[in-house]
Amino acid sequence: MIEATLRVVERDGASGVSHRTVAREAGLPTTSATYYFRGIDDLLCAALTSVMTEDAARMRRLAAETGGGVDSRRSLARLMADVVAVPGHLLAEYELYLLAARRPELREVTQVWLDAAADFARAHTDDPTRVRVVVAAIDGLLLQALLTDTPPGVAEFEEMLRMLLPHATD
């Protein structure tokens, strides 16, 4: 159901989510959606939780595998380029992510991703202000990539990350 919800958000936006559209997308009867999710907010919250948890886990894996330095910047640049290469999925994620701006009860879910991104930045710097800037920049760069016909590639993302995290071991 959650994957079906994400596909509906990708295709129709969050406003297109209903028990009926999600069940149809999942190839299930509408009663299945209403059985597992009482309301539309429950579906949207579950989808947001899923993508935030998945993104946070991916960021934590990347940080653990590279441990800081130029390799981690390059790996993050590669990850960002891979993410923007599938703009529909990224758009669905950001639509759900921005839902938390209007619904305070969803903000806790977004913190999982923000904490993982901050942990990645802390592997490069002890400066709390720089950590916040890096996290905001990652979000901003991904969001801006949705607004262009030619999103940045690995090399361009890596150069931007080098400017944000200049003290990583080169």
Tell where the protein language model's regions lie, with residue ranges:
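Helix-turn-helix
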Residues: 4-42, 46
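Solvent-exposed, amphipathic alpha-helical segments
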Residues: 4-11, 58, 96, 137-144
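Short, basic, alpha-helical segments at the C-terminal edge of helix-turn-helix-like DNA-binding modules
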Residues: 49-54
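Amphipathic alpha-helical packing segments from all-alpha helical-bundle domains
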Residues: 56-57, 84-94, 99-132
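Hydrophobic alpha-helical connector segments
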Residues: 57-90, 134
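Hydrophobic/aromatic-rich alpha-helical bundle segments in the mid-to-C-terminal region
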Residues: 106-107, 111, 123-170
